[in-house]
Amino acid sequence: MSGKSWVLISTTSPQSLEDEILGRLLKILFVLFVDLMSIMYVVITS
């Protein structure tokens, strides 16, 4: 699937499967980033 068709699908149906998967991936990446930052903070301050 090309980027243009993906944008077209995501704009016409926000509740599409691709958007749900992308949202979950972004949530997981954000959680991992926060965990990494907290671990780095503990390592630096200890």
Swiss-Prot record:
Expression induction or repression: Expression is regulated by MYEF2 and MYOD1.
Membrane-spanning intervals of the chain: 22-42
Gene Ontology MF term list: enzyme inhibitor activity
Recorded topology in the membrane: Single-pass membrane protein
Keyword terms of this UniProt record: Membrane, Sarcoplasmic reticulum, Transmembrane, Transmembrane helix
Effect after changing residue 33 to A: Abolishes interaction with ATP2A1/SERCA1
Lumenal compartment spans: 43-46
UniProt note: phenotype after gene disruption: Mice are born at expected Mendelian ratios and do not show obvious morphological abnormalities or differences in body or muscle weights. They however show enhanced Ca(2+) handling in skeletal muscle and improved exercise performance.
Tissue distribution of the protein: Specifically expressed in all skeletal muscles. Detected in both fast- and slow-type skeletal muscle. Not expressed in cardiac or smooth muscles.
Organism domain of life: Eukaryota
GO terms under biological process: calcium ion import into sarcoplasmic reticulum; negative regulation of calcium ion import into sarcoplasmic reticulum; response to wounding
One GO CC term on file: sarcoplasmic reticulum membrane
Compartment list: Sarcoplasmic reticulum membrane
Intervals, Cytoplasmic compartment: 1-21
Functional summary from the UniProt entry: Inhibits the activity of ATP2A1/SERCA1 ATPase in sarcoplasmic reticulum by decreasing the apparent affinity of the ATPase for Ca(2+), thereby acting as a key regulator of skeletal muscle activity. Its high expression in adult skeletal muscle, suggests that it constitutes the predominant regulator of ATP2A1/SERCA1 in adult skeletal muscle. Also inhibits the activity of ATP2A2/SERCA2 and ATP2A3/SERCA3.
Assembly and binders: Homooligomer. Monomer. Interacts with ATP2A1/SERCA1. Interacts as a monomer with ATP2A2/SERCA2; the interaction inhibits ATP2A2 activity.
UniProt-recorded name of the protein: Myoregulin
Organism: Mus musculus
